[in-house]
Amino acid sequence: GSDAINRLAEPIPARDLPTLIDWMVSNKVDLCVAGEESYLVKDEGLANACARVGIPCWGPVKESAQLEASKEFAKDFLLRHRIPTGQARVAATLEEAQEFIGGVYPTVLKFDGLAAGKGVAVCMCREEADAFLKEVFTDRRFGEGRLLVEEFLTGPEVSIFGALVDDHYLILCPARDYK
């Protein structure tokens, strides 16, 4: 978030999910707006924990948050529901990733896990791919995990957001991330 939030609210330490939930209950929080996505998927899941104590949460339950947390899960979901997506293979090792790339550039490499927005690399050449593969498999920059080697697609990338309550949904405005 923005530093300006300090003028509106007091930052609290959120060391772990149980501590955060206890704080929300003791301070009679009546709505939780999930920001940091890792809280949605680790442990019980923020939205799940909020539901357990009766606090509405603007954010997906742990099971649905896997769409953001796991590139492999998201890819399987897209394929299962016939949503157009690039072809991809999942590599568990550096050697396997190099084999799947097969000298074809550009290629897209995606770490299968949360990586604070840094887990995707569009590689135009072997040197760029090798550098990212080193970060993933040798340096373990993002922790343990697998990697998607994905077909490079051209055109604008658009994110579609929606809100779901029970069996009702609302599609929000599309958004683009200009990185």
Regions found by a protein language model. Name each.
Residues 1-60:
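ATP-binding N-terminal substructure of ATP-dependent carboxylate-amine bond-forming enzymes
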Residues 10-16, 88-93, 123:
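Short acidic-hydrophobic, aromatic-tinged amphipathic segments that line or gate anion-handling sites
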Residues 25-29, 103-104, 143:
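Glycine-rich phosphate-binding loop signature in dinucleotide/nucleotide-binding domains
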Residues 55-119:
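A conserved helix-loop-beta module that forms one wall/lid of the active-site cleft
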Residues 84-86, 107-108, 123-159:
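Conserved ATP-binding module of the ATP-grasp superfamily
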Residues 91, 120-125, 162-165, 172-173:
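Short beta-strand-to-turn element immediately C-terminal to the catalytic PLP-Schiff-base lysine
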Residues 136, 154-179:
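Phosphate-binding core of ATP-grasp and ATP-grasp-like enzymes
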